[in-house]
Amino acid sequence: VTWTATDSSGNSASATQTITVVDTTAPVVENLDSLTFEATTQNDNLIEIPLINASDNTEIISITNDAPILFEFGTTIINWSIVDISGNQYVVEQQIDVVDTTSPTIIAPSNVEVEATSMENNLVEFEFAEASDQVEISTITNDAPTVFPLGETIVTWTATDSSGNSASATQ
């Protein structure tokens, strides 16, 4: 920019001024929410994290994060880095939760028929139920009595996973 000043006698002088406009404002991210995904395993959950929305008064040249390839069950904090064309950087954290809301599967053992030895105090041996879960089975229980009365007794087996989800099957 050239500045010129003229006095009342018509004398003038000029000076040149250089004005440089620089970007010192970092990009911004709005509404970065925690994300929740269903677990498929204890340690190897393949999760596709959606790209975040960022804006800048110039041009964004990179949006990156440090998310692992495979997520463990539980909470992971990832860091996003947004850089604009002027080198301004904004770093923000995002919480990723991998949860287990799926009930385990359980298969009760086969039915058992034994010869009675008394009317009320029959010992019965039976197999154990089989259960599986996407993450981890905590307990497998049943409501079988210690001794069985004469006749049919329904035994309910229950599998509970580490997140408290449960499923039952009868024998």
State what each model feature region is:
Residues V1-Q171:
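Proline-threonine-serine-rich low-complexity tracts
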